[in-house]
């Protein structure tokens, strides 16, 4: 796992090792590299000023440029160079002023009137691929590259050809488990650098969404709409509105301003860190039912090595009920352990077993896929089948469960879920409001205040009530604090747990760039720090800045602060600009408690500062010989 950023200069150096078996032998091995932009600037201690976005360019129309013959082609190592020439995609004056003029500064979007400026890095794969040539191994490579630098960036953008974009978006949504940051996939019908271009808007919009909005999902941004990735499908070969989400409205619409439907965001609710599941089962398929299809065709399709299949049926999931031969083939397949999922051939709507013909499929052991798109159903099946620790029944249950917002599961509503908050009802009556729109406006005004008050009062029952009335768990107050910031500051572990279980983001930053983890660390709430780290929170300071705060804590004899940083995953051996570590500082001031703790934590004892002093030398110079002896005993 990456612990520091100081030595990172390319993704090739920091990506995790790829020891995963090849899924598809026709897959073309790829190399990921950057052209000019170095990751060294990530060590800047003042990174709270900007959001950081990594752009991964896989190929496709969006990045094509005209070659010597005037034809559009994917030319390697040209994308970033060309972006730097466009002032609406790169603010060169800001980048030079902020990062210097050494030629490898990050790209920076012009001011978009968002909370923070967005700096971004472009890395591209070699070879660049037409998306028709994408394989499951490419999905795995993208997922693992994101994992390798996950803690360095606030969001990710994947540039992709449109033909298989929906498959990639769906696959990544399942593979990226407990995702806490935005991953936005985009492409275009016209390249970025053409005079008329949807690619330019799609690119800029994607970088803004990844860097400025707390939407921890794999999404698709296209034609000014942000869709849930596993709900999308390509609907046109020639229109700029090439993608749609047939059974779910967009998560965000970019007009004059960007309107986000925060209530629809599918957030992780498990107290677990982000991980990548890097196995997929390619022995899956799509079988579209048509009139007079032969039982032999279906039988051959379901022969080994097939492990699962999506059956695309008529209407609301119907099959010809008089075709007992086909039903018998399906029944035999499910008895052999093949997982079959029933989805509709229609663009809109869902599978329902209200008809006799649909019920017959259920009796044959076929699972209802509800309103999943073919892309989502297929990639979900590939993901589920690859889970070797799940038995057959568990895999079937998981296919029927809404894992990443890919399907609409209609359940019984909780009793009282839609009841109005008592205070909203009281005020509405007092103001004699009769319009539902007026009541909704009152609710929008009051709910944030009520929510923050309940957090402050540690009132879980009230939080449940307000949440059931549509409160957004990641609401921000005027200082940019979320409810999780507030609970982390107060050290209320019970409330922190509740917020995390209801989708609170551990990565939200306030106006000073501080995360809830940083707030908890600075207040030495160790239990809260543990909870946040367990859920994927990580420190965002550069090693140099971390060295400064650790040295300050040790110099102040603040062992609790050192413990807080240790629990948060900090490298306690980080040095400040003078080369001093926390152990140097503790030995200088004579803090035996800090020295003992740092030694137990494994901090090196031989590090020399800029004056060539080791921690033991610092102890001796300041007449703390007992500390020097402690260090000698440790070295022995």
Predicted features by range, described:
Residues 2-148:
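ATP/NTP phosphate-donor binding region
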Residues 477, 510, 543-544, 576, ...:
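Ankyrin repeat boundary/linker residues
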Residues 459-467, 492-501, 525-534, 558-566, ...:
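Ankyrin repeat structural motif
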Residues 159-181, 321-329, 353-356:
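Short Gly/Thr/Asp-enriched flexible loops that form oxyanion-binding sites at enzyme active sites
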Residues 453-458, 486-492, 519-525, 552-558, ...:
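Ankyrin repeat A-helix N-terminal signature
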Residues 50, 56, 60, 78-100, ...:
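Accessory alpha-helical/coil subdomains and C-terminal extensions
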């Amino acid at each position: 796992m990456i612990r520091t950023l100081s030595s990172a200069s390319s993704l090739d150096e920091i990506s995790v090792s790829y020891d995963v078996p090849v899924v598809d032998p026709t897959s073309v091995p790829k190399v990921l590299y950057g052209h000019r932009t170095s990751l060294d600037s990530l060590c800047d201690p003042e990174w709270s000023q900007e959001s950081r976005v990594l752009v991964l360019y896989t190929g496709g129309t969006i990045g094509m440029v005209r070659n010597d013959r005037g034809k559009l082609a994917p030319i390697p190592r040209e994308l970033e160079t060309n972006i730097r020439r466009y002032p609406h995609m790169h603010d060169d004056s800001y980048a030079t002023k902020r990062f210097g003029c050494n030629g490898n500064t990050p790209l920076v979007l012009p001011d978009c009137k968002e909370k923070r400026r967005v700096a971004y890095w472009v890395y591209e794969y070699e070879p660049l691929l037409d998306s028709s040539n994408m394989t499951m191994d490419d999905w795995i490579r993208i997922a693992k590259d994101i994992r390798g630098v996950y803690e360095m960036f606030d969001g990710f953008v994947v540039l992709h050809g449109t033909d298989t974009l929906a498959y990639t978006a769906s696959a990544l949504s399942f593979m990226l488990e407990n995702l806490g940051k935005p991953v936005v996939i985009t492409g275009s019908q016209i390249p970025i650098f053409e005079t008329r271009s949807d690619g330019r808007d799609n690119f800029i919009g994607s970088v803004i969404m990844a860097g400025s909005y707390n939407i921890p999902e794999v999404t698709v941004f296209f034609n000014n709409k942000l869709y849930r990735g596993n709900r999308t499908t390509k609907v046109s070969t020639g229109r700029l509105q090439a993608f749609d989400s047939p059974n779910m409205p967009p998560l965000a619409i970019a007009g004059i301003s960007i309107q986000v439907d925060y209530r629809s965001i599918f957030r992780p609710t498990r107290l677990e860190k982000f991980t990548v599941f890097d196995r997929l089962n390619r022995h899956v398929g799509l079988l579209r039912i048509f009139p007079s299809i032969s039982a032999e065709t279906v039988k051959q399709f379901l022969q080994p090595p097939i492990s699962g299949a999506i059956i695309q049926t008529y209407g609301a999931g119907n099959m010809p009920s008089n075709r007992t031969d086909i039903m018998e083939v399906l029944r035999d397949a499910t008895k052999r352990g093949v997982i079959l999922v029933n989805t509709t051939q229609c663009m809109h709507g869902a599978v329902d077993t209200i008809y006799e013909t649909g019920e017959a499929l259920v009796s044959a052991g076929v699972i209802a896929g509800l309103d999943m798109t073919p892309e989502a159903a297929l990639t979900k099946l590939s993901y589920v089948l690859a889970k070797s620790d799940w038995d057959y029944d568990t895999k079937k249950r998981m296919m029927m469960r809404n894992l990443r917002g890919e399907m609409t599961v209609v359940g019984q509503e909780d009793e009282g879920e839609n009841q109005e908050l008592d205070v909203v009802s009281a005020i509405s009556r007092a103001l004699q409001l009769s319009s539902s729109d007026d009541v909704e406006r009152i609710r929008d005004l009051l709910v944030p205040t009520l929510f923050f008050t309940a957090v402050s009062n540690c009132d879980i029952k009230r939080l449940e009530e307000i949440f059931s009335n549509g409160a957004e768990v990641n609401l921000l107050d005027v200082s940019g604090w979320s409810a999780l910031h507030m609970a982390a500051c107060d050290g209320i572990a019970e409330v922190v747990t509740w917020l995390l279980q209801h989708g609170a983001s551990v990565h939200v930053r306030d106006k000073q760039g501080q995360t809830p983890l940083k707030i908890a660390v600075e207040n030495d709430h160790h239990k809260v720090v543990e909870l946040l780290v367990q859920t994927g929170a990580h420190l965002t300071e550069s090693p140099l800045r971390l060295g400064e705060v650790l040295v300050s804590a040790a110099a102040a004899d603040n062992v609790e602060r050192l413990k807080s940083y240790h629990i948060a995953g900090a490298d306690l051996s980080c040095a400040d600009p003078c080369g001093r570590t926390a152990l140097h500082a503790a030995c200088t001031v004579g803090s035996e408690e800090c020295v003992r703790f740092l030694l137990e934590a494994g901090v090196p004892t031989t590090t020399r500062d800029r004056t060539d002093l080791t921690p033991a030398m610092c102890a001796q110079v300041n007449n703390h010989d007992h500390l020097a002896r402690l260090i000698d005993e440790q070295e022995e």
